[in-house]
């Protein structure tokens, strides 16, 4: 299940991609610019959707791990939403600084990593999803600290996050049969 935070990340990535493409092609005719922008967006979407869901054997611990991963997702989403609300209020009040926003974002990422580490998952599929999510957030922490992120790297890392979400959704649906 995709929540608000992944949508924001995806929209930011797509917007950045479109903005960069538009800036690079500003001196070309409008028709060519639109074709390039659409092509770039299509490439990003293809990259995000290219990995199929992996098949795992059903185990007695599947429901346990699904519940833990969904609980992690719910708690992390609530925490992220609260942070976004706090930052929006500070922005509206004119008290938000770039440094504070970056610090809170880094705190949020580190919280995701800690929450993921604390999950006691018992299945191979659960640990696979946990690993994808952990890798995604670890890379986000690196990019926040480095302040440099290659667009292709961002797409690959977002693909990891979305793969984890799709895997969990598929896994949960397969348990209901």
Model-derived features with residue positions:
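Bacterial N-terminal signal peptides
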Residues: 11-17
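Long, amphipathic, charge-rich alpha-helical segments that form helical bundles/coiled-coils
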Residues: 101-161
């Amino acid at each position: 299940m995709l929540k608000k935070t992944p949508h924001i990340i995806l929209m930011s990535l797509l917007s950045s991609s479109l903005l960069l493409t538009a800036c690079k092609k500003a001196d070309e005719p409008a028709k060519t610019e639109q074709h390039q922008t659409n092509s770039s967006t299509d490439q990003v979407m293809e990259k995000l959707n290219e990995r199929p869901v992996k098949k795992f054997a059903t185990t007695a611990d599947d429901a346990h791990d699904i519940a833990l991963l969904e609980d992690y997702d719910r708690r992390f989403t609530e925490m992220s939403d609260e942070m976004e609300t706090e930052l929006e209020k500070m922005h509206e009040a004119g008290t938000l600084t770039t440094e504070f926003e970056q610090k809170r974002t880094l705190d949020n990422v580190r919280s995701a990593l800690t929450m993921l580490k604390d999950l006691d998952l018992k299945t191979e599929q659960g640990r696979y999803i946990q690993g994808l999510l952990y890798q995604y957030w670890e890379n986000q922490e690196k990019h926040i600290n480095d302040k440099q992120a290659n667009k292709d790297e961002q797409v690959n890392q977002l693909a990891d996050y979305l793969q984890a979400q799709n895997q969990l959704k598929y896994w949960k649906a397969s348990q209901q049969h």
